[in-house]
Amino acid sequence: MMPLPRGQAIRRDGGLWAFERALARYGLAPVAGVDEAGRGACAGPLVVAACVLPEGRRGQVPDLADSKLLTPTVRERVYEHVVRRALDFRVVAIPAADVDRLGLHVANVVGMRQAVAGLRVRPAYVLTDGFPVPGLGVPGLAMWKGDQVAASVAAASVLAKVTRDRLMCQLGDRYPEYDFASHKGYVTPEHSAALLAHGPCPEHRFSYVNVARAGESSVGCQDGENELVIADTMVRA
């Protein structure tokens, strides 16, 4: 990924729009922000979102922030604002089976590439949260805690998180014994107890140590394939 134009410095405390405004001054607009949800979960999909917000007042989203810093109620409200105001966005869900097959990091990179490639509004620059993503086809910058310092990345984090939470609630209806709606597939005492009691289901990530160990002691639930989450999902209002 390419850095900002030479000699350009941006204060990280300059507000959520500092990076996008600086890039626009160099003709690098529109900007797409990319983030994911579900990296640390041992069940459910890895969800990646790319989002392009309009410049100026049209792109201002009330209460926009890193999705992890928002309550579920506020996050849902911000999600609806982002969907209405975004120039474009794309949400990609990578099923648990593909996370196992590819490995977490590769699955994350693949999801980010798919999300950016699926945008109808082609970005001039891409901001990603955390690590560089090769093969995007446009210049970009990896940002530490990008979802806390760049508006487009924060918007992508909300899209990814809300989409994934909704998918996990659907999986909770399908596999009620795991209570996915409560913990969203992350490791909690309750989730660990359910894994030991019932074994893993097809929506668990078998490459994760705790899931593999639970699978050794129980046959788990085997009713069906990974049907709910598809590998490339367009989510629009």
Regions found by a protein language model. Give the residues of each.
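RNase H-like, Mg2+-dependent phosphodiesterase core
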Residues: 1-237
